[in-house]
Regions:
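Anionic-ligand binding patches
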Residues: 2-4, 10-199
């Protein structure tokens, strides 16, 4: 089955395509179907924002659409930046500027648990949807390490591996990331739907 990915983030598209292709899902980008949408993320939860994005692309294309809303939640900041992770610090900052700001805001803070959260929503033309959530716990590093990944990956330390998310190979990341975990939950629901076991 073909689904349109409601994202313009090339690295996110590559990551999701790698995981979804193993399920036999053909992932199309918005560019592939001649659409250029960037719906405003007005939700206050990851679930709401994923739903907004998936439904907008579904309505524009008539094809099933899958969206991910994800972010970093830092315990010491009451879950911030959370749903505002991609906009943390305002529109003038890039990924590096955002994690640098976060590190400045955490200066002197010894309590550094955090988690990446991803919510996947797939909206179908019949009005139904699949919603799945994945989390990956970690610790906010004192400084960046690694050149892989994107977003906050260079400062997201995984104690069990002794590496930041940015130090992992794409294959390693696709085994343990929040997005991989959300997609595993999505896969379970997808298989139920397509094997007729959800009725």
């Amino acid at each position: 089955m073909k689904v349109v990915l409601a994202s313009h983030n090339a690295k996110k598209i590559t990551e999701m395509r790698a995981i979804l292709s193993q399920m036999g899902v053909e992932v199309l980008s918005q560019r592939d179907v001649g659409v250029d949408l960037e719906p405003e993320e007005t939700g206050t939860t990851f679930e709401a924002n994923a739903r907004i994005k998936a439904k907008a692309v579904l309505e524009a294309t008539g094809l099933p659409a899958i969206a991910d809303d994800s972010g970093l939640m830092v315990d010491a900041l009451d879950g911030a930046p959370g749903v505002y992770s991609a906009r943390y610090g305002g529109p003038g900052l890039d990924d590096t500027g955002r994690w640098q700001l976060l590190l400045r805001n955490m200066a002197g803070q010894s309590h550094r648990p955090c988690r990446f959260v991803s919510v996947i929503c797939c909206a179908f033309p019949d009005g139904s949807e699949i919603l799945a959530r994945g989390e990956c716990p970690g610790v906010l590093a004192e400084g960046p390490s690694g050149a892989g990944g994107f977003g906050y990956d260079p400062i997201f330390f995984l104690p069990q591996l002794g590496k930041t998310m940015a130090q992992l190979t794409p294959e390693e990341k696709n085994q343990i990331s929040h997005r991989a975990r959300a997609l595993a939950g999505f896969q379970t629901e997808w298989e139920k739907r397509h094997n007729g076991t959800d009725q």
